[in-house]
Amino acid sequence: KPVYDLYDRLIESGLTSGQKFTADPLPLDKHVPTSLLEDIVFRKIMYTQQDRYEQQLKKLGITADNAYTCTCYLEQVGNTPKQGDILSWAESSAVVYANSVLGARCNRNSGMLELMGSIAGFVPEFGLLTDEGRKAHWLVEVKCTRRPEAQLLGSAIGMKVMEDVPYVRGLDTWLGTELNDENRAYLKDFGA
């Protein structure tokens, strides 16, 4: 509740994001039918502030009613950063993809901190925003006779390196060097 109260204070002060933004996926989809038990558990107990939150994001500058996505970097969303761009994103897979594939710079912080960054127009400079924070701590060499399954390989690497930065070598054997739709999909599933 304190988060929603803070959002109300920001709105009452007239603050909004300097640019339109997307947000993490919603936990509930109003267009999907639910049972009485689901309504009680999800709408009356777990997500009682959902409508309030959505209205607050509209007032703070969310792009559209359907701007809740974990793939905010896709062309159809209209939020694809360029290499070197500093981002204020909270969705973990989008942060990894932006850093690894697109060459943007972004930390994975809470949605609240990222919204504050969007309103302020800047974010704290630490971690993956710095050259030092982007240096790899692990060298991962992929040596397989066929293209590895993206989610399996990404999960295995992630479980080993945890919060460290890996440098993955060898995927170009199957992906080449062009960032086409097929490679984008593979790297998205890989978690890169």
Named regions from a protein language model:
Residues 1-192:
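Non-transmembrane, aqueous-exposed alpha-helical and coiled segments at domain scale
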